[in-house]
Structures are given as structure tokens and as C-alpha cells.
Amino acid sequence: VLLPAVLLIRRPPVRWYWLAAYGTTISFGQFGFMFTALSVGMPTGLAALLVQAQVFFTVLIAALLLHEPVKPNHLLAIVVAAVGLLLIGVGQYSGAMPLAGLMLVLCAAFSWALGNIVVKRIGRVNPLSLVVWGNVFTLIPFTLVALWQFGAEGVWQQISLMSWRGWAGVLFLAYVATLVGYVGWGGLVSRQAVSKISPL
């Protein structure tokens, strides 16, 4: 995400602590917890499903901190979605969900929700510059987590043994899923009530 974008895109006119808050919640927190959950045996399909709990966390935090009203139709939609997530998760993955993995995915969802609130508090800025410069604060934490999990030799081995498919996946995550996806997402969240956007 950082290179070469950080060299080409101007830093958004917000304080550094807001950029740090954005990077450490919606980027490092969300994906750090998610990838750690996968490493302890959490099924990928179930992780992708349960991380949508960010909707519930976002609506709750927005009501508490931003004083956004929670309308009855929002509550009904949340209840229906929660029941649906529960039924799908229990039905398809019964017995295949490690407790540690579950807690880590929920932490990822909570981090995503916090990131949504940060975007809302920052207000209307160029979402592309926010994504790029916010990720300046993720480089060191991600590096430390990788070294903690795999060690320097393990990290180097994984990099050196990656196939072209692996590198294609990295590029897709960095420049399509993150830049394109989160630029669009951030633009919506900054302009609308987060309780309206988060279920999307």
C-alpha cells in the first residue's frame, strides 16, 4: 500500500494522531487479528463471516460516542443479521471453530468498527490519502508481529519461497482490496451515518 503511493500522494490535512488511529485500527488491528486467527486454525470462510460482526460493534460505538440514533429498523436488521450469522456459522462449521480463533476474529471486527468511527471523526478528507498515509503507522507493528510469529529466518523463508500466485495475492490485497476497497468505504463512512453504511 505504501510504495509508491506515499511518494506520490500528499498527506491529508489531519493531525498525525488521527492517521495513527486510523492505521492501527482499520488496518493493523483488523488484519493483524484476522491473520493471527487464521494461523491458529480458524476456517477462512467462518472468519470472513464472523468479521461482519463489525456492523454490530459499529452501530453500538456510534450510538455511544457519536450519539447517532439507532432506529427500530436498524435494530431489526441487526437482530436478523445476527441470527443469520449464528445459523450459518453453527450449521457449516460446527466443531471446527477454535475459541482463540473466534476471539481473535471478534477483535478484528471490533478494530474495524473503531476504524469506522475514526474515519467519521476525521471527516471529509481525500480517502485515498487517508488510506495511504494511515498505513505508514502499520509497517513497524506488522513487522514486529511477523517476527514474533515466525522469526526473522521464517519471514525470510516465506518471502523467498513465495510463488507468483502468492505475490499476485499480495498485490491484490494491497492495491485492489485495500486501496480501492477502503478508499470507497472511507468515502461513504465520512459522508453518511456509520450505522447506515456499516451493514453494506
Regions found by a protein language model. Give the residues of each.
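Hydrophobic alpha-helical transmembrane segments of multi-pass integral membrane proteins
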Residues: 1-6, 21, 74-80, 100-104, ...
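Helix-helix packing/entry segments at the starts of transmembrane helices
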Residues: 31, 47-53, 118-139, 174-200
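Hydrophobic alpha-helical transmembrane segments in multi-pass integral membrane proteins
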Residues: 32-39, 86-94, 98, 138-155
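Hydrophobic/small/kink-forming positions within alpha-helical transmembrane segments
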Residues: 23-32, 55-60, 86, 109-113, ...
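Hydrophobic transmembrane alpha-helices of multi-pass small-molecule transport proteins
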Residues: 2, 61, 70-91, 109-110, ...
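Hydrophobic/aromatic residues within transmembrane alpha-helices
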Residues: 37, 64-66, 70, 122, ...
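Loop-to-transmembrane alpha-helix entry segments
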Residues: 13-18, 48-51, 67-87, 95-102
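Specific alpha-helical transmembrane segments that line the substrate/conduction pathway
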Residues: 26, 35-69, 108, 194-200
